[in-house]
Curated annotation (Swiss-Prot):
GO molecular function, one term: L-cysteine desulfhydrase activity
Stored HAMAP family: UPF0597
InterPro entries referenced in this protein's UniProt entry, alphabetically: Ser_deHydtase-like_asu, UPF0597
Protein name: UPF0597 protein ASA_0240
UniProt similarity note: Belongs to the UPF0597 family.
Pfam families in the cross-refs: SDH_alpha
GO terms (BP aspect): L-cysteine catabolic process to pyruvate
Species of origin: Aeromonas salmonicida (strain A449)
Amino acid sequence: MRNTAMKAQWTDFITLLKREVVPALGCTEPMSVALAAANCRKLLGQTPTRVSVWVSGNLFKNGMGVGVPGTGMIGLPVAAAVGFTGGNPDAGLEVLNTLTPAQVEEAKALLPIIKVDVKDVPDVLYAEVLAEVEGHSARVVICTDHTRIVLMELDGEVLMEQNSAPGVQIQPAKSDKPAMTLREIVAFALEVPLAEIDFIGAAATMNQALADEGLQGYGLRIGKILTEQVERKLLSDDLMTLAMRLSSAASDARMDGAMLPAMSNSGSGNQGIAATMPVVAAARFLKASDEQLTRALVMSHLVAIYIKTHQNKLSALCAASTAAMGSGAAITWLLGGQFEQISHCINNMIGDVSGIICDGAGSACSMKVSTSTSAAVKSSLMAINNLHVPQSEGIVSDDVDETIANLGRLSKLGMLDTDIEIINIMRAKQQGKAQ
């Protein structure tokens, strides 16, 4: 350890990884609604006769068409219903980890009394659930982060509001200015004592299990189809195909409601998959050691977190594409690249896939995960041959940290109208179905 400041930063990096890389069962936006509903039920102590759910436009977008684990159904009303009947209010993003078939049947009976609408709020991630029965009511609000409960009310009395309640731990919102650089991340991943980061191996284990499940056939079956084409000799059994197969299979299973958790990144299972499975595939293909895989995963997940800190929690930019940039960096290192080549890889990816929109969570996410994975491998292969997008083009800069900041600016400022129109289109579709 060269100095005290570095030791403190490395400690911060480890804390950040442990906070942002956590298990999550099901797509995280519907799970926020389920978690709010589970806490409402805990406060109310009985089954409600009327439930109102309000969400931000972005949460609506990511919850409209995605599968809810263990139900075989999609959508925010379903998430709220099973949150009431079987949600564990203390389980965070694994709120539905003990859901039973009987509780799913109970939830179906609640669907007619649940109304979901979009609320005009400043937070892009916002979920509010109000449950009522026989003159009693309970209200729970989650905002900023998927499990950050900021308000609990029972019969109009505030029980907890932000940090005011003793014993209630709430994660602070992230700083707008990331306290890290790519060079610092790479140095940490390669130099930190292995014993301090071996916990990241759980990401490989957990997301590999999800990929194995996805290969059985979920959602759009991208992973299964790609595997079948390898067997038919229509696709090569190479690094890029293996990475696409594993990544898309895990996403297939996750978005179709498989009852297996994903190791998430920055509050998203697909981001966790995109930051994990391409690296696992590369390590397997290249016969990397366990230590190399561990360090590569740390690099990938920290890069994904770093890039995400420049963006809103939810936006019009596909975050799986940016999380895969972490995988690209790690694969470049596994292929023998140094910091310069790792920088080239990220610049290549930003020059390639930075325009992929997020039009809500759903089965098509696995297509975007596989596309971003292929871009990660392609950009890595270019980078180790010192080929890269020149700084004279688009939003790419010679300074990779500046390029990342430019991407964040595009997401936070340039794509606001895009986000609004995506949400408007999706709301119009839903209203058309309701008529």
